[in-house]
Every structure is written in C-alpha cells, then in structure tokens.
C-alpha cells in the first residue's frame, strides 16, 4: 500500500505531520542537544495562519510569474474546481468537529492545547519577502504513551509482533516516535544494527592516536561533553573516523513556488532535490592570445554582468523533473552556499496543494549539510593592477564572492537558529547585524555604480596610477587622526644601539629605538593560555537531527569554527596569534627613518645570529646540513636576515647608508636586483649558513611583484622558486610604504605574502587621503583583527561613509596609537629646542613674464580650453567632459614652460631639419666658438671667398681683442651687448633688433644697415664672453683668457623660464663656483629642453628620472655627491619625491607647480633634511597672469574650505570641482 494514496495533509496522523517540520523551537535542540519531543513550526516569515485556512468552497488564486514553466499536459486539470477538503483546525487553533471525530478514540480525555503562534525568523531585522501570505497550520500536540491498538490505528494496518517489539523498545514509550519510526523504516536499521555506544564524556581515539590538544581545548571539550544531555533512547550512534563529505548542521522551513501544474506532482512528505544549474565562470576579455602559464588576473564585475546574476534554485522530483523554485529571498543566499561548495541541501515537502498550479506556493523543509570542501583553504590569487578609471571603486569577483559568502553563512545560521557555543550571544548578534549592514552597503554601492554608468565625477586631482577606493578625508580629519599619533612622550626611555653601529643617534632616535625594541621583543610566553581568535566563532555539531534521531559523530570534532568576516570555516581550533611584532615608523621626511631602522637591525638579532657571530666562521668539515622540508611547512627560516623593500631609486642609497652606519667587518649587505638575483636565497640565508648569511637583503617593489607573479603560476609552491617567497625572514621593512596603499594592486598583494617574524613599514604619510590607505599597511603588518577587510569595512568604512565620522575616526585612532611612532620637524623638546636643528629654508616665487610669441601660443590654448568649458556648461555636461577639459588645462600648463611642448612634434621636427640644413649651407650654428671660427676662416684657400673670409676673420679678431668700436646705429662706444649679422657687421644687440623690427613693421624685407644684404632674425648672433670659466683654467703660470662664443639671438629666448633659469645659474656660478643645485620639473620633455640650454651655456649637469635603470640612477647619485665642481641635477618630480638624500645641494629650482604643494615639499625636503648644514633657497618659477598663478589660489582656497567647513556632501564636492575649473580658466 502506498502511503501517499491513503493520506493527505489535512487528515493525516499528527505524528506524521510533526516529523517533517523544522527543529526551530528549542535553541538547545538545534545546537545539538536532545529534546523530549521534536518541535515544529510554520515555515519562515509566514503570515497569520488564518489566511491559509480558507473557506472550503473558495479557490486559491495562483501568482503570476514571468519565470514560470507551464506543463501543457496538465492544463485540462486547471479548469476543474478545487475539491472540498475537511479542515483540521479552526482559526483560533482548536480542532474542528471533523478532526475531533477522527481522533475521538485517543483525544477525548486530552486537555485542549493553546494556539501556537506563527513562526518568525530569529535575529533577522528585516522581513523576508515571500511569494504568498500563506502558512500551514501549527498546533501543539500532547505526548501519548505507546499502545499497540492505537499504533495500528494510526498506521492503518496490522503490524507483526517482532516489529512491534523493536519499535516499542526504541520509541521511548512515545507513540509519535513509534509511528515515525515505522513509516520511515528506521525500525529496520535498529533491527539489524549492532549496538555501538559512544562515551560523550571522553573523546574517542581512532587508530590508536589522538591529536595533541592544549589544556584549554581539552577543558573546553570536557565542559561541552558534560553539558550535552544523555540520549533518552538506546538508539546506537554511528562513529566516523574523520569528517565525512557532508555533515548535517540543521534544518529550516522555506517557501517555494511551482513551475508546473497537475495533480499528484508533489505531496506532503515527498523528498525533493535542491539543485542549481551549472553557472559559467566570468571570463576576461583580452586582445590576442594569452601565453601559456601566464597567471590570470581576478576579473572585475562589470555593470552588465552584475545585472545578469543567476540565483535561481530549483527543486526537482526524484526523476530530475523541475517542480518549482525557491523564493528569491531564500534563493539569494542558498544559491551562494551551493555555488561556492559550502553546503548541500535536501528537501522534504511540508505542504503542497493536491492539485498543483503554476506559481502556487509550496512549503518545504530543507536539511542542510556542510561539505568537507568548505573547510579547505583557498588558493593564492592575483589582483588586478590596472586602473579602470579615476578613483574607481570596482569590486573584484573575489570580493563579491566573499561578500555573498558572508551574508549566506549569517543567514543560514539565523534560519537554523544556531548560536555560538562560546562568547556573548548578544554581541555576536550585534556583530552579525553590523556585518549585514556593511554587505548591504557594498551591494548598494555596486548597484548605484551600475546605474550611474560611466559618468566621470572626479575631482581636480591628477589621474592616479591605480584605482583607489573609499571617500577622501578632509584636511581637518587628517589632522585629527595624526594628532594622537604625534603626541610624542619625550619622557620615553632611550636605548643605546649595539657596538657594531658606527653612528651616533640623536635623543629622539634613541627613544624610537627603545620603542622598536619593545615592539619586537614582546613575545608571547609559552605558558600563556591559548585563546581563540577574536574574529572566529565556535559552533557545536548537532548530535540529533530534526527528527530527534542520533547523528553520526566524529571523534575529537565536537565543534566547527566560522569566521563571519572572511567567510572561512575550520575544523581546527583557531588560535589567537601573537600580536604584531613590528609597527609603523612615520617620522616626517628628513628625520632619519633609515638610520633608525639600521640601528634596530644592529641592536636586535635572533638567537641563531648571535650564536653564529660568537662562533665565528665554521670549517668545511663542521658545516651543518642544509634544511629539509617536511610536513606542512612552506618556507625556510632565515633567522639572520632582514629584507628591505624600497623603490628602485633608493636601493643604492640603502646600501650606501647600511655600509656607512656599520663598523668594518660587522655587517653584510646584499643587493637583490637585476643580475644579482641569480643566487639561491634558501641556501644562502638558511640557518645552516647562519655564519655567512647576509644581514640585509635590499630589493625593489618590482622584484617582489615579479617573483609573486611567478609564484602564482606555480600554484603557490613557495620553495620551488628558491627566492624571496621561499624564506621566512627575521624582519621585513617596507620603505616608502605608501606604494602599497591600494590593497587591490598586485604590488600590495605581493608584499602581503612576504613571510617574516617582524614587520615594519616606513612612510611619512601613513594616510595619504583615504582611510583605506592605513588598512593596507595594517594588513601587511598582520594586526589582528584589523587586517581583515570585512572587519575593517564593518567598523570603520561603513560608519565613515554613513557620516558617522566620530565613531569611525575614533576607531582609527585606536588602531594608530599603538602602531605608529611619528615625529615632525617642527616638534620641540621640553627645553624648547627643535628635534633636528636645521638651517633656515627660504622659498621665493619668481615671477616670469612670457615673451610675445609665448603669450600668443598660451592665449590660443587658453581660449580653446575656455570655449570647451563654456560649451559644456551650456549643455550641463561639465563633469562628463572633465577628462577633455583636464587635458586642455594640462596643455595650458605646458605652454607656460615652453611653447614647443604643445606643438605637433612631427611638424616641429621638419622645421628643425630645414633650419639645420640652412645653417650647414651657411656654415653657421646656434652656438659657435669664436677661435674656431677664426681658424676656419683663416684656413680658407678658395679665391672666390677669400676676400669675404678675410673680412670676417678681421671682424672676429676685433671682437676677440675687444677693439674699440662704436655702434653704427646709436654711435655708442663701446657697443652694448655686441651682436653680429650674417654678413659680419656689428652693432648693439638692441639697436640691431629694433632696426629689423622697424623694417618688418613697414612690411619691408630687412636689409643690413651697412652692406644692404638681406638679413633675418636667425642670422643675428650675440657675442658671449664666458668670464665664469676663468677658474677652470688648468695652465699654471699662464694668464687666463676668457672663452668667447657667438650664440644665435633668440635660441634661448623661446622659453622665458629657461632664460630665467640660465640667468640664475650663471649668477650663482659666479658667486659660488662649487655650489650644487636641483632643477625639478614634472615634465621630462621640459627637462630635455633645459639640458640643451645648459649644454649651450657650458653648465655641467646630471639627470635622474623614472626612465633610468637602477645602476644608472646609482651612478648619477654617486657622481653628484662626490663632485666638487659646480653641478646641476635635473630631477623629475616623481623620481625626486621620495627617499633621496641630496643634502649636498643648496639651491632648488621648481620649474612648474603641482596641484598640491605637499608633493613639491617632498622634493624640497630631499635637500632640507637632517645632514644639511647650509642655508637652503628655493625658487618657484610662476608665470604671471597664467593658469599657474590661479593654481596657487585654488590650493589656498581648498585648504581654507577643508579646515573651516569640514566634510562636504557629494553634491557640494561636485559644485566645488566646477568652481575650481572655472577659477583655472578665468581671466585675471
């Protein structure tokens, strides 16, 4: 007899109805403890029961859904009326007369139960959207004793005596349990299974071995076992040797809706399969073919892909035919658990209409099983290092999966009503609420971005190299954050460096050394009690399922652990790791961060390094064996070596300072860059080679990234590379650590993976302009729990973006305070002295007046940019066209430096080629040595040109001998700034130029004032006497003669800034023949033009920019430091903004302004820093009545707004950006 043919939902035995409903009632029962009888309730978020219990003559209206799949074979049934079915309960929860009649034999003497309230989800603040406002009836049932006749009346057939004996023996004298055991066949297993008992008070030992456990975890296991009630029956418990493929964790009720129509498709008690269709992983569109072995970057989630997210979860019958789908609210998170191989689900129908219609509501109970794969670690992945836009906050696929995983786990535990077995349940509830709010915030941000499309709403900052995230901090907020970090206690004890350190530290440096030593030596004692990691939660595996049946147990695995912030699961106890043994040295630039770290390296060595140093060199016969790797160890210890990661331009400086700060023979440094990388670091730095291991390895961020990329292609096999990631260093130091401020960049990810006992970062700006800048440093330092981005986002980012600034900034200050040591140059000691007594620094603005040709070019670019702004303002598209307007403003700034920078380079090259050809034909050049010209003219033997050459030679000799000669135009004697025409006639430079202008103004072709030959401005040469070269003469006893040259008039006048610079440098060379200077510009093409001018004027110079190799940079810096002659260093703003020590220079020339003066100040501080002994003068070249003057005004106004108005809304910021653009393109 098929039980489905004899029973329906309304007149079925109470025990059969109860066993298919969820175990939601008792928290003790859900957590794993037994209950006297199983509890049940309606599915989640069901409305009042009376809506389900409709009039027998009424018809249930189906929902309308676009996604419904109709079964055409059953369409004929849809036209029939519903059968009238007897009601089992009234609206107030009491039994109907029909039910009373059926149950009279055993309910006459029973007390009437109270109505049961509808089921509501616990710990869920927002109601779940359900497809229908219906719910199955719910009622409490009294417990009945087992009786043979009553039992057979319930099951509807005679039962053999041996079966009755087994059931009565194992049902605990409970008729409900007896009926359930008979109907689901449990009695058969009990009849055959051998009795196996488990002692819940002590863990079982499988295979004769038991894993070692700490005293704390053993005590925890004992207390947990004692808290578990003993089973009420003698049902045997199955013992598993290890974690099975899937393990039961709980059950819960859900709603679904049918996608088929027909009779008998789904009935109460039927099992259904919960399935997902296979989804395709996102692909990255790339041009061309990807090379084999190239690691794939994590794809970013596009707006279109975000809209196509498939969360459909289907329930199918045993044959695989789809019957319906889960409600969307439930499917949202159930689909995530299935897709990410965290859980699998089994379904049982609780309620379905006898004749099912499309879109009709079905109630299911889902049993959830945690998969073993969910407890396995995740593999190493790369991040996308490309910038998708200005300050774009794209969410990577990995981060989206993490967010969905977090929400899914939290919702699952809420549904099955499982709570942590350790810790404060109320605190856990609040933390989950905050985590869901953070996830909702991230989801809302992603949706807003998808709606916004590609609209560019960026500020006036220059385009960054990497996509950044988070709201920008205003200046007053930054000041508030640094206030605590900079409240330095001058009473801090001092520490003396080791005797191998060759330098003398200042008092404030000795105090920081004491602080750093204290941070590194704060080791956790071995006997300290092991505590659980604060981000993890402990949960107890259930020992009974929703039917109150015993579940299989795994010895020594009574609990599992969940990190709701990272979505990780573990079967092992997550220990609280030792807190950060390092920190952030954030002293302002010029206070000697490098020297302080070197003193730490000398003063704190590992025990292995100390013993190796005391033992001295080891003989070959006594060399220890090289290490072998066993077990799960992935790196080899390098107990004697500190790794320093710095920008490429600072590698040589680190090596030089490390050698200078160490006594001879006490310190070994190694450069790990370029050709020097061809070494086996594992063999060189391992403990077996401690006596010969380098004390410091210096490498660049680029090398770290390169080896990290290779590591990813090898699936994270660290030891195979024998490089940086194969070692666990004693210490790692990141210099200029703001290079890793973007947590999503590959460089940042690579640095996070460096293994080291102690971790330090050096930066003058821990927070550049976003709170996420600090998070990246905290993650590198591995500061628990803040290095978890989900935790950071929950307690810092979301409150800040929700305008709860006080809470967010207070939390950040608590993070900063124990980690950061920061001093500034304007700090004073208690006796009123500056920390570092530096010589004065004077900054002077040099006003530059553009020449007429330059002004013409500038006005053309200015009018075009202004017209573009006006057109977009009229159309209301200023922010859309911001990139175009910004590019035109950039061209405007370049025109202030040199008109050539904004001209078409191909046309310019053609013009220069034509001019050079004309000069070759005439024997002329921009810069000609007078003596060479005389010798050339004298050596001419051609009779046709001999006369002219003799005259030219005669004129040149007069110039050389300074023969008295008056100007033929103004009669001034001697001539003022003597100039020579191409036909070798002389006059005052100003007179000659005015004479030519007078003729061109009258539209006449200029002619020579003496011989009437045609002349032009390119044929006018100025006589230059190089008096400043006298001191370079090396001939002893000879009277020095100045070098004389003829330079084409206007060759240097094409740029007013270059003319001013040359004038300053020539004057400086006359006054200080051995002084060194810096010339800084953000445009490397402008530096090339300056270098040409310096060459023409015989001014010695060197150049350093980002295009140079590390060896070339090191050579330039060494030469600049060692030369004792007048020298100029041409420096690009980016290359000179970090880390360099250029105290040998005394003058700084800033050729063009940057958007923020703080960037210029970084470059200036390369000169004005500790070690500078002379006064420093800075000259900022600013063109009058230009965009450069207005840039300075915008900077000042923005500082005022930041400090006086504080945080502005997004709309206010947008308006401010437009005002900034208007200001830049306004007319003075």
UniProtKB/Swiss-Prot annotation:
InterPro entries: Helicase_ATP-bd, Helicase_C-like, HIRAN, P-loop_NTPase, SNF2-like_sf, SNF2/RAD54-like_C, SNF2_N, SNF2_RAD54_helicase_TF. Keywords: ATP-binding, Cytoplasm, DNA damage, DNA repair, DNA-binding, Helicase, Hydrolase, Metal-binding, Nucleotide-binding, Nucleus, Zinc, Zinc-finger. It is an enzyme of class 3 (hydrolase). Residues 574-784 form the Helicase ATP-binding domain. Residues 445-454 have a biased composition (Basic and acidic residues). Belongs to the SNF2/RAD54 helicase family. This is DNA repair protein rad5. It comes from Neurospora crassa (strain ATCC 24698 / 74-OR23-1A / CBS 708.71 / DSM 1257 / FGSC 987).
């Amino acid at each position: 007899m098929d039980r489905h043919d004899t029973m329906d939902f309304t007149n079925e035995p109470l025990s059969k109805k109860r066993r298919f409903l969820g175990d939601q009632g008792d928290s003790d029962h859900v957590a794993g403890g037994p209950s006297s009888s199983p509890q049940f309730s309606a599915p989640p978020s069901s409305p009042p029961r009376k809506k389900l219990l409709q009039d027998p003559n009424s018809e249930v209206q189906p929902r309308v859904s676009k996604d419904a799949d109709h079964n055409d074979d059953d369409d004929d049934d849809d036209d029939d009326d519903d059968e009238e079915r007897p009601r089992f309960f009234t609206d107030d929860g009491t039994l109907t007369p029909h039910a009373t009649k059926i149950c009279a034999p055993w309910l006459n003497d029973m007390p009437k139960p109270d109505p049961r309230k509808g089921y509501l989800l616990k710990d869920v603040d927002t109601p779940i959207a359900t497809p229908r406002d219906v719910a199955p009836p719910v009622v409490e049932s009294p417990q009945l004793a087992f009786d043979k006749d009553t039992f057979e009346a319930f099951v509807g057939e005679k039962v053999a005596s041996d079966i009755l004996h087994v059931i009565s023996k194992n049902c605990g004298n409970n008729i409900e349990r007896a009926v359930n055991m008979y109907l689901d066949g449990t009695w058969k297993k009990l009849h055959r299974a051998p009795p196996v008992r488990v002692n819940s008070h002590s863990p079982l030992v499988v295979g004769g071995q038991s894993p070692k456990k700490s005293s704390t975890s053993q005590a925890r296991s004992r207390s947990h076992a004692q808290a578990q009630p003993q089973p009420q029956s003698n049902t045997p418990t199955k013992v598993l040797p290890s974690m099975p493929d899937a393990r039961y964790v709980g059950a819960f009720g859900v709603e679904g809706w049918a996608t088929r129509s027909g009779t008998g498709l789904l009935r109460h008690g039927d099992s259904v399969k919960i399935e997902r269709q296979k989804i395709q992983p996102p692909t990255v569109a790339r041009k061309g073919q990807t090379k084999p072995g190239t690691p794939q970057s994590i794809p970013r989630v596009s707006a279109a892909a975000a809209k196509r997210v498939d969360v459909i979860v289907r329930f199918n019958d045993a044959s695989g035919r789809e019957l319906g789908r889960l409600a969307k609210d439930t499917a949202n998170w159930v689909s995530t658990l299935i897709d990410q191989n965290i859980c699998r689900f089994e379904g049982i129908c609780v309620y379905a209409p006898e004749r099912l219609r499309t879109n009709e509501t079905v109630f299911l109970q889902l049993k959830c099983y945690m998969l073993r794969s969910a407890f396995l670690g995740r593999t190493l992945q790369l991040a996308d290092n490309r910038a998708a836009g200005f300050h774009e906050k794209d969410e990577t696929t990995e981060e989206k999966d993490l967010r969905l995983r977090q929400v899914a786990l939290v919702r699952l535990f809420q549904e099955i009503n499982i709570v942590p077995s350790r810790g404060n349940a109320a605190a856990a509830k609040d933390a989950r609420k905050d985590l869901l709010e953070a996830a909702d915030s991230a989801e809302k941000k992603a949706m807003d971005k998808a709606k916004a499309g590609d609209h560019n709403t960026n500020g006036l900052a220059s385009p960054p190299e990497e996509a950044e995230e988070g709201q920008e901090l205003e200046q007053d907020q930054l000041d508030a954050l640094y206030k605590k970090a900079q409240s330095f206690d001058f009473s801090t004890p001092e520490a003396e460096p080791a005797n191998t350190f060759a330098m003398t530290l200042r008092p404030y440096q000795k105090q920081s050394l004491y602080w750093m030593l204290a941070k590194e030596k704060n080791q956790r004692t071995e006997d300290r009690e092991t505590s659980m990691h604060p981000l993890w939660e402990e949960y107890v595996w259930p020992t009974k399922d929703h039917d109150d049946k015993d579940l299989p147990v795994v010895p020594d695995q009574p609990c599992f652990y969940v990190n709701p912030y990272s979505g990780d699961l573990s079967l092992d106890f997550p220990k609280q790791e030792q807190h950060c043994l390092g920190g952030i040295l954030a002293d302002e630039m010029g206070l000697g961060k490098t020297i302080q770290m070197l003193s730490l390296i000398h003063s704190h060595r590992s025990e292995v390094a100390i013993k190796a140093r005391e033992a001295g060199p080891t003989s070959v016969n006594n060399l220890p064996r090289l290490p072998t790797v066993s077990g799960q160890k992935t790196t080899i210890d390098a107990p004697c070596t500190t790794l320093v990661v710095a920008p490429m331009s600072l590698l040589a400086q680190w090596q030089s300072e490390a050698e200078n700060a160490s006594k001879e023979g006490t310190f070994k440094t190694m450069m790990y860059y370029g050709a020097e990388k061809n070494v086996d670091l594992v063999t060189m730095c391992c403990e077996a080679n401690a006596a010969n291991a380098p004390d410091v390895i210096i490498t660049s961020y680029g090398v770290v990234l390169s080896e990290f990329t290779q590591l990813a292609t090898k699936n994270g096999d660290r030891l195979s590379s024998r490089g940086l990631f194969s070692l666990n260093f004693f210490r790692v130091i990141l210099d200029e650590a703001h290079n890793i401020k973007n947590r999503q960049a590959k460089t940042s990810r690579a640095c996070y993976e460096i293994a080291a006992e102690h971790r330090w970062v050096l930066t003058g700006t821990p927070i550049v302009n976003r709170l996420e800048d600090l998070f990246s440093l905290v993650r590198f330092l591995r500061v628990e729990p803040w290095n978890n981005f989900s935790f950071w986002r929950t307690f810092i980012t979301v409150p800040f973006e929700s305008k709860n600034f006080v809470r967010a900034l207070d939390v950040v200050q608590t993070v900063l305070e124990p980690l950061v040591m920061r001093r500034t140059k304007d700090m004073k000691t208690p006796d009123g002295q500056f920390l570092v007594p530096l010589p004065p620094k004077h900054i002077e603005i040099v006003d530059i007046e553009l020449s007429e040709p330059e002004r013409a070019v500038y006005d053309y670019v200015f009018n075009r940019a202004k017209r573009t702004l006006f057109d977009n303002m009229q159309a209301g598209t200023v922010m859309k066209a911001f990139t175009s307007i910004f590019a035109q403003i950039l061209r405007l700034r370049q025109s202030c430096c040199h008109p050539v920078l904004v001209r078409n380079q191909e046309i310019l090259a053609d013009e220069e080629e034509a001019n050079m050809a004309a000069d070759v034909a005439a024997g002329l050049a921009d810069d000609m040595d007078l003596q060479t010209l005389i010798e050339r003219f004298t050596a001419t033997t051609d009779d046709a040109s001999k006369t002219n050459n003799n005259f030219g030679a005669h004129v040149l000799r007069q110039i050389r001998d300074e023969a008295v000669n008056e100007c033929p135009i103004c009669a001034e004697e001697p001539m003022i700034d003597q100039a020579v025409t191409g036909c070798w006639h002389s006059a005052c430079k100003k007179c000659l130029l005015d004479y030519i202008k007078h003729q061109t103004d009258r539209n006449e072709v200029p002619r020579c004032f003496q011989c009437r030959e045609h002349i032009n401005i390119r044929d006018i040469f100025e006589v230059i006497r190089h008096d400043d070269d006298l001191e370079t003469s090396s001939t002893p006893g000879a009277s020095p003669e100045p070098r004389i040259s003829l330079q084409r008039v206007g060759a240097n006048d094409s740029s007013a800034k270059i003319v001013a610079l040359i004038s300053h440098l020539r004057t400086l060379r006359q006054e200080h023949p051995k002084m060194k200077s810096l010339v800084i510009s953000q445009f490397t093409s402008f530096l090339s033009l300056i270098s040409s001018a310096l060459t023409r004027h015989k001014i010695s110079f060197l150049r350093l920019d980002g295009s140079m190799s590390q060896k070339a940079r090191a050579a330039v810096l060494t030469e600049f430091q060692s030369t004792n002659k007048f020298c100029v260093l041409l420096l690009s703003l980016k290359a000179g903004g970090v880390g360099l020590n250029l105290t040998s220079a005394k003058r700084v020339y800033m050729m063009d302004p940057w958007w923020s003066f703080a960037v210029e100040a970084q470059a200036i501080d390369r000169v004005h820093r500790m070690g500078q002994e002379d006064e420093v003068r800075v000259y900022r070249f600013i063109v009058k009545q230009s965009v450069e003057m207005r840039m300075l005004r915008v900077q000042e106004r923005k500082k005022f707004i930041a400090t006086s108005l504080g945080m502005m809304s997004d709309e206010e910021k947008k308006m401010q950006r437009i005002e900034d653009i208007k200001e830049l393109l306004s007319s003075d």
